[in-house]
Amino acid sequence: MTDPMDTGEARALRDAVRTLLTRRSGPAAVRAAMESPLGHDDKLWSTLCEQIGVAALAIPEHYGGAGAGLAEACVVLAELGRTLTPAPMLGSAVLCGEALLRTGNDEACERLLPGIAAGTTLAALAWSAADGRWTPALRASDAGLDGRAHYVLDGDIADVLLAVARTDDGAGLFEVPLEGVRRSRVTSLDPGRRLAVVECASTPARRLDIGGFAEPLRRLRDTATVAVAAEQVGAAARALELTVEYTKQRRQFGRPIGSFQALKHRMADVHVHVEAARSALYAALVDGDPEAVLTAKVVCGEAFAHAAAEMIQLHGGIAITWEHDAHLYFKRAHGTALLFGDPGLALSR
């Protein structure tokens, strides 16, 4: 079966995104974006949306999208992962877009999705408690929503706030007015991942789902897991590329250190991990069953963590300086591994 991330259209999309990011999202630009008030380069995000249509990829055409799918969104996420470019792609375009589509609520989709697809509306999804699991942190009652949701992607700067909450019938998806909540940015290990805490206290909210959200939430979790796996694969591959390039340039004992057999073996081992991660991502996209998705979470996370660790080891002392990007890949590796639940829990399942 054809790899959905390696079709002619996918390769053209990859080339377009990579060309733009190479020109506009180099290491200095990435650091500047991380330190900006929004935590990302808004002009770059606008260009990605207007010229390439990245936010519209997984949204149907009748809601203002491109009518592609998760595989195409994963192509973009992998490229963003390569350069560690901070962007609202994961939280707004993928998670919130998917959440709205799974409500079965045409009115809400017609009202909210066109702005998300255009990249002019930034949406955030709140659900997780402090343990990072998918059990909704918020509780819905006649009085409104109560509780505290953690790890909300772009939650403090979002224009639209969606929340998954526990209900008497299981779970529901709610649209929450911004003036009714307290939103606080939190410092995280990864400076390129903007996270927030969202607190509700009898906050009035509008329920969007039709017929319950328990099963859609499971599918949304799978989508989120696959999307992060794509980012991990792209970042792991780039970490390996940078390491190989460095070992070809760095000389010791009169020859490039990459010519030493011990280092060749270590880089070959990273390559095997990266290719295994690509295969796991492919299986998750093509099969879509929960086991394949959980496998991708574990394999892709481990591959990225291994590539980032070896990047530091094989670069030597320069890799532990603030000016070098190795620590940013390392932080992204460990941050993404825990973003949608502990990999250890996935293994136990």
Can you describe what each PLM-predicted range is?
Residues 1-81, 119, 222-349:
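Alpha-helical interface subdomain recognition
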Residues 88, 110-237, 241:
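FAD-binding core of flavoproteins
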Residues 94-98, 215, 227, 265:
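Positions in alpha-helical segments
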Residues 41, 92, 133:
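Conserved donor sugar-nucleotide recognition element shared by glycan-biosynthetic enzymes
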Residues 87-106:
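N-terminal glycine-rich flavin-associated loop
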Residues 63-64, 100, 151:
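Short histidine/acidic/glycine/proline-rich micro-motifs that form metal-
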